[in-house]
A protein has these predicted regions:
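C-terminal structural segment of proteins
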Residues: 1-290
Length: 290
């Protein structure tokens, strides 16, 4: 690994000042679980890392509002999210998914903000957050902006964040009567990266499906909603035929990529099956399935 300088600012504003948008050899580092592996492999060779570990504690907090919304600081470790009673109450699908996310050593170090800013399409959290309608706050030299998580990812390991822009907070809106589930397929161990991840959020009104959000990840270049599959469900009856229709629409719509975890045609068939399975899982009570 190439030697580098480590800077440790004490505030978010100071950290942003240290990030030169014209210098790609300066990178921020939060937990570092992904970045350090890439540096050891020689994928990245930064000459300077701006550590975010000494930022104020409010950037690691979890707070629930009276209206049912949830705010999670960008520096909050995934293990704290996993154990949070507030998260379990507002979005129980998240702590359930965390139990199958890598291993406890990684979850103790990896952060919410780093998980999103890294832009890795194989991660479990982004598709779930998209299904939940979550947003991030991103701070830059001229102020702050809100970005829907579904708009955050630009491509394979790419986000729309500027080089001198940092995620400060994640916000999950009140979920009302929506029920959410996440299913993934791993071709290796349970700790392995998934070949396909599917997150869904559905709201039922009587025997009719009022709304649906269907998100696929890992099989694609970025976590993304399948709006054609959502439209195939909206306003229809809640039955296995509707779930099959949505699965077929998802398989037709999705653009899968081939990699070591499977070919694009194989992953397309996984999407077909697991969209159907995730919808049933959500309406049966939510949760995580494999």
């Amino acid at each position: 690994m190439t030697p580098f300088e480590l800077l440790e600012p004490g505030s978010l504003a100071e950290a942003i000042k240290l990030l030169d948008p014209e210098d790609s050899d300066i990178r921020p580092i939060a937990g570092g679980t992904a970045l350090m592996l890439m540096m050891k492999a020689g994928v990245f060779r930064p000459r300077c890392l701006v550590s975010l570990r000494k930022l104020p504690p409010e950037l690691s907090r979890i707070s629930a509002g009276s209206g049912g919304e949830l705010a999670i600081g960008a520096m909050c470790p995934l293990s704290r999210v996993e154990r949070s009673a507030d998260v379990a109450r507002v979005a129980p699908v998240i702590p359930r998914a965390m139990l199958r996310l890598s291993n406890v050593r990684v979850r103790n170090v990896a952060t919410v903000g780093g998980c999103l800013a890294h832009g890795d399409p194989h991660m479990d959290l982004p598709p779930i957050l998209i299904a939940l309608g979550a947003q991030v706050s991103a701070v830059h030299p001229k102020g702050e902006r809100r970005i829907a998580v579904e708009d955050l990812f630009a491509g394979y390991f790419e986000t729309i964040l500027q080089k001198n822009e940092l995620i400060s907070e994640l916000r999950i809106p009140p979920q009302g009567g929506a029920r959410t589930a996440y299913c993934k397929v791993t071709t290796g161990s349970a700790e392995d990266w998934p070949a396909v991840g599917v997150a869904v959020s559905v709201e039922q009104e009587g025997s009719v499906l009022k709304s649906a959000r269907i998100v696929v990840s890992a099989a694609t270049e970025k976590a993304m909603r399948l709006k054609g599959a959502e439209q195939a469900l909206a306003g229809g009856a809640v039955d296995d035929q509707a779930f099959k229709r949505a699965g077929d629409a998802a398989a037709d719509e999705v653009e899968c990529i081939s990699d070591v975890r499977g070919s694009a045609p194989y992953k397309r068939e996984l999407v077909r099956v697991f969209v159907r399975r995730a919808l049933r899982q959500a309406l049966d009570g939510g949760g995580v399935a494999h």
